[in-house]
């Protein structure tokens, strides 16, 4: 019988104490009677009595049977029926590859749920103003709707309402401190404010609460590396950018099209470290790649190759200031 590596993360919010207690009772009943305790999550480890929610920060089980996986997911789906907000992601992996992914989120007829789901669909279609109205309604119905705050934060960011975006991301993080999406969004606002140190802190939390099988993990490493580069923290930039440079992204992945920029910035970081050999290798690699989503020119790359071959560190790398180092914008795409 095959065993699988299981990763779960998420949160369910309940509208009141009664809903929470019913969810808890149903979970315990299914675990005890239906599944004979053949699950890998005990209620006392995931039900937060003080906050009336189910909290599962990133949880990893190295060896779980197919049956235990199915039982646990089924029990969590039962819990979700009583929730008004939240979501849970579950991955089943074999030999490092995802063979099943489940996203569990409320889908009932309550107005808070339907308003959020509508807002989520509208966000995906780029209808930001209509999405904001729907998410406003979801938040009015459920003040602890972390997912609605997070989605509205991204809408406000795209509408360039950066102060409102920061408010939304902060509210989402208060309810769910383990939300990788909310920390990622807040980091973007910090970058707009040129507060790269705070952005890096949020990116660190994003990495802690995401996994390499998610696009957000690699996008975070790429942009975090860029922040380190801007601050002149070249060793840290190299540490983040090397794994991204080695990764192959499929066209449907939003990380696709950024590899030339990654190699260019990696070359800059090596140049700042006075590692001219590796700088030349990275920059030549960038030169050989086709144009992607960056706005780099051939002259940008050739100019740095010339500097690296001269064995001299340009002044902008010796005394880095925000804006002095060209990173291959658009920075926040």
Regions found by a protein language model. Give the residues of each.
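Structural marker of alpha-solenoid helical repeat scaffolds
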Residues: 141, 175, 209-213, 247, ...
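Helix-start (N-cap) detector for alpha-helical repeat units in TPR-like alpha-solenoids
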Residues: 112, 146-147, 180-181, 214-218, ...
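Alpha-helical segment of the N-proximal tetratricopeptide repeat
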Residues: 105-161, 167
């Amino acid at each position: 019988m095959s065993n699988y590596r299981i990763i779960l993360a998420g949160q369910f919010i309940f509208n009141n104490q009664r809903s929470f207690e019913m969810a808890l009772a149903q979970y315990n009943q299914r675990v005890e009677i239906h599944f004979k305790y053949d699950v890998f999550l005990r209620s006392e480890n995931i039900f937060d009595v003080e906050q009336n929610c189910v909290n599962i920060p990133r949880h990893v089980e190295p060896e779980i049977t197919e049956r235990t996986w199915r039982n646990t997911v089924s029990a969590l789906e039962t819990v979700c029926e009583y929730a008004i907000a939240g979501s849970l992601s579950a991955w089943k992996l074999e030999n490092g590859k995802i063979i099943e992914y489940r996203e569990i989120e409320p889908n009932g007829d309550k107005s808070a749920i339907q308003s959020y789901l509508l807002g989520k669909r509208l966000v995906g279609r780029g209808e930001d103003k209509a999405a904001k109205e729907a998410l406003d309604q979801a938040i009015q119905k459920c003040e602890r709707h972390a997912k609605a705050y997070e989605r509205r934060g991204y809408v406000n960011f795209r509408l360039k309402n950066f102060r409102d975006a920061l408010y939304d991301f902060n509210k989402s993080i208060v309810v769910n401190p383990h939300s990788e999406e909310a920390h990622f969004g807040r980091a973007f606002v910090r970058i707009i404010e040129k507060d790269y140190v705070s952005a890096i802190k949020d990116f660190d939390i994003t990495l802690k609460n995401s996994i390499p099988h998610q696009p957000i993990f690699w996008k975070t490493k790429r942009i975090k590396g860029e922040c380190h580069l801007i601050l002149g923290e070249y060793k840290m930039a190299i540490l983040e950018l090397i794994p991204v440079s080695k990764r192959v992204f499929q066209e449907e992945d939003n990380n696709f099209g950024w590899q030339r920029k990654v190699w260019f910035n990696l070359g800059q970081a090596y140049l700042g470290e006075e590692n001219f050999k590796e700088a030349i290798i990275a920059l030549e690699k960038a030169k050989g790649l086709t144009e992607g989503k960056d706005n780099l020119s051939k002259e940008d790359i050739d100019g740095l190759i010339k500097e690296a071959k001269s064995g001299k560190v340009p002044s902008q790398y010796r005394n880095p200031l925000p804006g002095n180092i060209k990173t291959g914008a658009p920075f926040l795409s």
